[in-house]
Design a protein with these regions (language model features):
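N-terminal small-domain helix-loop-helix segment of the aminotransferase-like
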Residues: 2-6, 11-103, 110
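Aromatic/hydrophobic pocket-lining residues that form π-stacking "cages" and hydrophobic walls in ligand
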Residues: 21, 25, 132, 193, ...
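Helix C-cap/helix->beta junction micro-motif
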Residues: 31, 139, 199-200
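Short acidic capping loops at alpha-helix termini that bridge into adjacent secondary structure
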Residues: 92-98, 118-121, 168
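Conserved PLP-anchoring active-site segment centered on the Schiff-base-forming lysine
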Residues: 114-136
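A short helix-loop-beta submotif of the ANL/AMP-binding
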Residues: 138-144
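Active-site phosphate-binding strand-loop segment of PLP-dependent enzymes
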Residues: 144, 149-220
Length: 228
């Protein structure tokens, strides 16, 4: 009988917080240890529910939601994103620059599939949110990890980034505020990364999904590469 094996593209696809780490936590939980499962963004078990007005709006518009929307996403949603960008003073964000999807994970995967040929490289922070490495690998590319130094408050090592750029490098991923380290990069650090990207003509993928979850004092506000 013919045996089917998984694709070698999965060799470097790991998601330990939903795999080995979760299995160990479940084992400890079974033995009586109380476990707080903060490994995934699952708000419902912690009683964070969607606001009632959003639930009501979803019910009200359900009939109108049948069928396909514009390939870039629902116009009203894209307009709201544009207005939000304007409130944050982000320059040059027009309605036609905005694409929406079923969560950022889908859009990351689509971006890598559309950009990378076999052997192309994307610079990814280490440690990283594992989706980035997985998406690059599944698209046939190579995730080249640059160091985020624990001894330097988990900031990116700019010299390490420069050393790892090759003729096959197409882009660099910035996760700020960072997942999983929680580091918030300074304007100076971001400017250095932007200058490296400019000089080598690299695309910057700026993952800022946690930009409103900064718990430090207001004096330590987050910076976005979009301002630079």
């Amino acid at each position: 009988m013919r045996k089917f094996s998984k694709s070698h593209k999965l060799d470097h696809v790991c998601y330990d917080i939903r795999g080995p780490v979760l299995e160990k936590a479940s084992e400890m939980e079974s033995a009586g240890t109380k476990i707080l499962k903060l490994n995934i963004g699952n708000p419902a078990p912690f009683n964070f529910s969607a606001p009632d007005e959003i639930i009501h709006d979803m019910i009200y518009t359900l009939r109108d939601a049948e069928g396909y929307s514009d390939s870039k996403g629902i116009f009203s949603a894209r307009k709201s994103i544009m207005q939000y960008s304007q409130l944050k003073n982000l320059p040059n964000v027009g309605i036609n620059d905005i694409y929406t999807g079923n969560g950022v994970s889908e859009l990351i995967t689509m971006s890598m599939q559309g950009l990378l040929d076999n052997g192309d490289e994307i610079l990814v922070p280490a440690p990283d949110y594992p989706l980035w490495t997985a998406a690059v690998t599944l698209a046939g590319g190579n995730a080249v990890h640059y160091i985020c130094d624990e001894q330097n408050e988990w900031n990116p090592d700019i010299d390490d980034i420069k050393k790892k750029i090759t003729d096959r490098t197409k882009g660099i991923v910035i996760i700020n505020p960072n997942n999983p380290t929680g580091a918030l990069y300074s304007e100076e650090i971001l400017k250095e990364i932007v200058e490296v990207a400019r000089s080598h003509q690299l695309i910057i993928f700026s993952d800022e999904i946690y930009d409103r979850l900064v718990m430090d004092s207001l004096s330590r506000s987050g910076y976005s590469v979009h301002y630079l």
